[in-house]
């Protein structure tokens, strides 16, 4: 039986739609009355694990799920040993550096050395600032990072941006771009190598009109 890790939240509906097109119907997870965290597919040959976004690559890396759907932002932050199989082309957003619009900073390079930067994605932020050779103090937050600059705790934030509305409504502007992010189909490397064909058929079906990274 194929086990698929699905992230609760914004990516769930589109993930279920894509798996349905590949022959795996997990629509039961969209039922508001559902309280199960392990849900079988209608065909009975697969089951879905409903987990938090950041836990998807963990379940896949440890082989408790053979496939999963997660944002590229999460893959970049945690860098778990999983196979990045298909760019599913939904859940589009990007990682950016933002500051108060009243500040004089117009690029990350303008920020003062050793300033505080708030983020949920401290690993992504660390690599970015190391790449531009700017030492900063990273402050890890789990929500509402926009409050960092507004309260004076941080000069800047590194966060995901979709429409930019939250930034605008809180008087913040983007000053640098780290990378674009979309939902990705990921796989457990050993399971893919030992696959008798079931996993490959699902991956190929989900790869229709999308970008894939062939696996061996």
Swiss-Prot record:
One Pfam match: HisG
Keyword check for Glycosyltransferase: yes
Pathway annotation from the record: Amino-acid biosynthesis; L-histidine biosynthesis; L-histidine from 5-phospho-alpha-D-ribose 1-diphosphate: step 1/9
Catalytic activity field: 1-(5-phospho-beta-D-ribosyl)-ATP + diphosphate = 5-phospho-alpha-D-ribose 1-diphosphate + ATP
GO biological process: L-histidine biosynthetic process
One of the record's GO molecular function terms: ATP binding
Presence of keyword Nucleotide-binding: yes
Location(s) in or outside the cell: Cytoplasm
EC number: 2.4.2.17
InterPro entries: ATP_PRibTrfase_cat (IPR013820), ATP_PRibTrfase_CS (IPR018198), ATP_PRibTrfase_HisG (IPR001348), ATP_PRibTrfase_HisG_short (IPR024893)
Enzyme kind, highest EC tier: transferase
Coarse class of the protein's main subcellular location: cytoplasm
Domain of life: Bacteria
UniProt keyword annotations, A-Z: Amino-acid biosynthesis, ATP-binding, Cytoplasm, Glycosyltransferase, Histidine biosynthesis, Nucleotide-binding, Transferase
Domain notes: Lacks the C-terminal regulatory region which is replaced by HisZ.
PANTHER family the record matches: ATP PHOSPHORIBOSYLTRANSFERASE, ATP PHOSPHORIBOSYLTRANSFERASE ATP-PRTASE
Role noted for this protein: Catalyzes the condensation of ATP and 5-phosphoribose 1-diphosphate to form N'-(5'-phosphoribosyl)-ATP (PR-ATP). Has a crucial role in the pathway because the rate of histidine biosynthesis seems to be controlled primarily by regulation of HisG enzymatic activity.
Quaternary structure note: Heteromultimer composed of HisG and HisZ subunits.
Homology family: Belongs to the ATP phosphoribosyltransferase family. Short subfamily.
Protein's name according to its UniProt entry: ATP phosphoribosyltransferase
Source species of the chain: Prochlorococcus marinus (strain MIT 9211)
């Amino acid at each position: 039986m194929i086990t698929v890790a699905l992230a609760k939240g914004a990516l769930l509906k589109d993930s279920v739609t894509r798996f349905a097109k590949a022959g795996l119907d997990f629509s039961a997870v969209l039922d508001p009355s559902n309280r199960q965290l392990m849900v079988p597919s209608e065909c009975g040959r697969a089951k879905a694990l409903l987990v938090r976004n950041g836990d998807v690559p963990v379940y896949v890396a440890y082989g408790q799920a053979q496939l999963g759907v997660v944002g590229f932002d999460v893959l970049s932050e945690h860098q778990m040993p999983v196979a990045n199989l298909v760019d599913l082309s939904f859940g589009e957003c990007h990682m950016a550096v933002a500051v108060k619009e009243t500040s004089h900073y117009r690029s990350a390079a303008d920020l003062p050395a050793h300033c505080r930067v708030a983020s949920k994605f401290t690993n992504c932020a660390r690599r970015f600032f190391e790449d531009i050779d700017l030492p900063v103090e990273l402050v890890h937050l789990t929500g509402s990072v926009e409050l960092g600059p507004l309260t004076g705790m941080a000069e800047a934030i590194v966060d995901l941006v979709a429409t930019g509305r939250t930034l605008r409504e809180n008087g913040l502007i983007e000053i640098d771009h780290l990378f674009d992010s979309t939902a990705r189909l990921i796989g457990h490397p050993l399971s893919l190598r030992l696959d008798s064909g079931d996993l490959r058929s699902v991956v190929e079906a989900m790869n229709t009109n999308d970008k894939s990274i062939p696996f061996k």
